[in-house]
Structures are given as C-alpha cells and as structure tokens.
C-alpha cells in the first residue's frame, strides 16, 4: 500500500496525540499547508517545507507570515519542496539547503543552497548544488530527506521515481543514498568512486525504493534509513557505505537470504491502517528529558497509521508503541533540549512531546539574572550567565543553552555557566536557562544579547 500526498489533503484541527503516562504533547504552531519536512535551528527556530514551494519559519511558537523563501516547483503527486538541512556551521555562515522538484528545463529534483538574512533568504543567494536526473511521468518516489553527517558531508536520500530498475543501477542517482561535500563535490572515499563517473560518484548506497527519511545518531554516527515499501513491508535499514538494500529483488527480508543484499534491521508488514514509514529520529539529545530507558531509542512514524513507535537497539531492536492519534505524520526531529518534535501533515502542525512524570506536574520557575535581556556583550569576552530557579519539590539542575547548543549544566544554586562570546560582531545570540525538577518537569527562561 502506498501514500500519495495529493490524495490526502483534507486537513484536520491541530491537536495533541495520545502519549504514555508522564509525557506531554503540545502544539507548537499550526496553519501549515501540506508540510513535508522540517529542520530545527540552534536558535530555536523551526524551518518547515511546504509541498507547494514555501519554506516557512516558526519562531517563538509563531508561524511567521512571510516565508523564508519560495521556490517554483512541480507539486503534483509526491513532488514539491521535500527536504531542508542547515549547514553544520549555520550559526556563523547562515547557509540552508533545500531539495525541490524544479520545473525547468525539464522536471527534475534539485538541491540548492540559500543564505539566510534574518528570517528570510537573501535575495539572489540561491546556489545550485546538484541537479538530479530528469523525472518520468511518474510523480512518486522522490525521497528528499537531507542531513549533514558527523563527517561534515551532506547525505541525500533519493527515490527511484517508480522505476525499480533505477535502484540497482550505478548509472543513475535515483534509488540511492548520496554523499557529497557541502558544495556538491565527491568525497574521495565514496564507495563507488571507481565504478562510476561524474555526479554518480556521489552514490553512497543503492537498492532503495523511496527512502523517505533517515537519521544519524548523536555520538555514534550510526544511520538508520526508512524505506517505504510497495505492498507488504516497511523497512528500517542500517545505513552503511557501499550497501545494497535489495530493491526490487527483495522487499523486507530477502527470502531466501541473499548475501548480496543487506537486510533491514527491522521491518513491519502493512495492514488495513498502515501504508508508509515516514519520520525517523534517534533519541540522543545533549540534554535528555525522557527517562533513561528511552535514550538511544529510534522513534519512527507511519503516515496512514498515525502513530509513533520506538525501536530499542540495545534490546535486540525490540519495538514498542509510543504515540497514537497523529494526523499523517511525515517527519520527526529531536531537539538539543530533549523534546521529540513531529510534523503532522494532516493537521498542518508541528507538535513536541516532552516528559513530566506522573504525580507532579508543577513546573519550576526560572529567570536569567545575568546578562540582562538585550544587553550588548563584547566579542571574544568571557560572560558568566547566572539564573535563579525554584520548585515545589526542588530543582535538580539548570541547563544553559546559547543558540540552542548546550553550554553547561549546574546542579547547585546559585546556578551559573561560563560562555565565551564568539568573534563575529553585530550577531544576536539567544540565551536560555532551563530548570528541571525531580519529576522531569521543566521551564525555560529566554533572553537575547548582541555581540559588539
């Protein structure tokens, strides 16, 4: 069974999913039109792709009226604006990458880079990184997910354009996982570099049907690839350089086993409710808030099933239910401060799941006492960030973030953290202090400062 975006455009009201006891689900923002993918920025903004070509920005819980950018796309079927990734050095270089179905000179998928100027793209900043092969009349199996790996290279999942033969051919980038430099170049250690030429040397793995999403695990660099099956099996594959995942010879586990192909680490059979594995994300944030047994788990979603489940690699890839009642989930992301975000296409919303143990749902109070909001701080200076925090059962720790990156944690009052101000001038930095209590409830204080 398959999903086609164009057939599923009936929006529902944004609402919270059903989550386990102790967890919370909150609507961050709604009003999105056919969203397809998202990326979390270090400063707390969320960039969301809309299939029709607009890249939207959610800032401080508000969907900004002006899109970050709008590209001209073919949005028929599963085509459109399908992927977004932030450069690893986004804080300093402000570079954002997108994957979209371009209309000229022929219909094909394109990877481009833009430069941010605040909450919009700098006019005229588009740089084309890669033009993918021209597409057939089939409008499905485009892939589109993009992430920078721990090696600093850009990984891009590309569908086989509904032509199974593409997946096994090294003469096309369709049906592949690609690996390229940030400028579209070929890393010298790519696995098929001596078997291909030109842009096909970016092929990193093959035998994929429609790899809709994938995720890297923080700390280990392990990659899981979610590959949408045809009629029977939805796959989670271990992303390993040079692998052939078997499509279209195999769907799910090869039967009989075939040593030429890498079987999935987990596959589930479609039923009357499920149709396509979509979002996927490892839970390894800098500051976890979920219970310890969730850390290292891989969360994944099914588009038609409307659920999120979790796979535990440390327990033999055992799978457990987690959240239900989501309207067409398409993407999952984990933030540095330990929230699990999901993108609900049917509801046009971004939600986040947090944890607050049963029995105590009173959040701490927290305030940043230094520096002052909107203060000017000297470049390359050492600033001590201080905060006060209190709670009905006691504060266990305060985490300090600058532009979404954890700087340090303090478990003893008065709570403080040292921060070295970077060199660029006229740069705005968001500082957050997040206080936790023993039940996992948390609250955040936010200020901003400018370096000069």
Residue ranges and their predicted role:
Residues 67-77, 125-139, 183-204, 247-272:
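Surface-exposed loop and turn segments in beta-propeller and other repeat-based domains
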Residues 180-182, 351-358, 450-452:
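Short beta-strand-to-coil "C-cap" segments at the C-terminal boundary of structured domains/repeats
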Residues 60, 236, 402-404:
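Short strand-turn-strand beta-turns centered on an Asx-Gly dipeptide
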Residues 1-17:
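Sec-dependent, cleavable N-terminal signal peptides
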């Amino acid at each position: 069974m398959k999903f086609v975006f164009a057939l599923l455009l009936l929006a529902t009201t944004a609402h919270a999913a059903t989550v386990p006891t102790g967890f919370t689900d909150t609507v961050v923002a709604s009003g999105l039109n056919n969203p397809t993918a998202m990326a979390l920025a270090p400063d707390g903004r969320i960039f969301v792709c809309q299939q029709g070509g607009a890249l939207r920005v959610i800032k401080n819980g508000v969907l900004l009226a002006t899109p970050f950018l709008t590209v001209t796309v073919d949005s028929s079927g599963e085509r459109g604006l399908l992927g977004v990734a932030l450069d690893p050095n986004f804080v300093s270089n402000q570079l954002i990458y997108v994957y979209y179905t371009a209309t000229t000179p022929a219909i094909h998928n394109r990877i481009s880079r833009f430069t941010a100027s605040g909450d919009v793209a700098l006019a005229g900043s588009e740089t084309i990184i890669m033009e993918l092969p021209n597409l057939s009349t089939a409008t499905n199996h485009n892939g589109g997910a993009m992430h920078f790996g721990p090696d600093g290279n850009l990984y891009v999942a590309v569908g086989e354009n509904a032509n199974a033969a593409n997946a096994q051919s090294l003469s096309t980038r369709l049906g592949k996982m690609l690996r390229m430099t940030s400028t579209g170049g070929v890393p010298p250690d790519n696995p098929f570099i001596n078997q291909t030429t030109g842009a096909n040397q970016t092929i990193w793995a093959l035998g994929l049907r429609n790899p809709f999403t994938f995720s890297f695990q923080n700390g280990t660099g392990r990659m899981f690839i979610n590959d949408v099956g045809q009629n029977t099996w939805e796959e989670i594959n271990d992303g390993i350089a040079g692998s052939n995942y078997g499509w279209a010879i195999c769907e799910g586990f090869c039967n009989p086993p075939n040593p030429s192909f890498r079987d999935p680490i987990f596959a589930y059979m479609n039923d009357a409710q499920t149709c396509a594995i979509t979002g996927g994300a490892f839970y390894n944030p800098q500051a976890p808030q979920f219970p310890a047994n969730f850390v290292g788990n891989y969360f994944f979603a099914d588009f038609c099933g409307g659920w999120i489940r979790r796979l535990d690699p440390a327990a033999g890839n055992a799978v457990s239910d987690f959240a239900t009642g989501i309207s067409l989930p398409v993407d999952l992301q984990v933030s540095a401060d330990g929230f699990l975000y999901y993108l609900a296409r049917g509801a046009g919303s971004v939600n986040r799941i947090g944890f607050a143990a049963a029995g105590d749902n009173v959040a701490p109070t927290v305030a940043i006492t230094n520096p002052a909001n909107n203060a000017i701080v000297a470049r390359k200076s050492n600033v001590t960030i201080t905060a006060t925090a209190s709670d009905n059962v006691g504060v266990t720790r305060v985490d300090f973030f600058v532009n979404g990156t954890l700087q340090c944690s303090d478990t003893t009052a008065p709570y403080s953290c040292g921060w070295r101000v970077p060199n660029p001038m006229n740069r705005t930095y968001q500082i957050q202090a997040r206080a936790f209590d023993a039940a996992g409830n948390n609250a955040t204080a936010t200020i901003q400062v400018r370096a000069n």
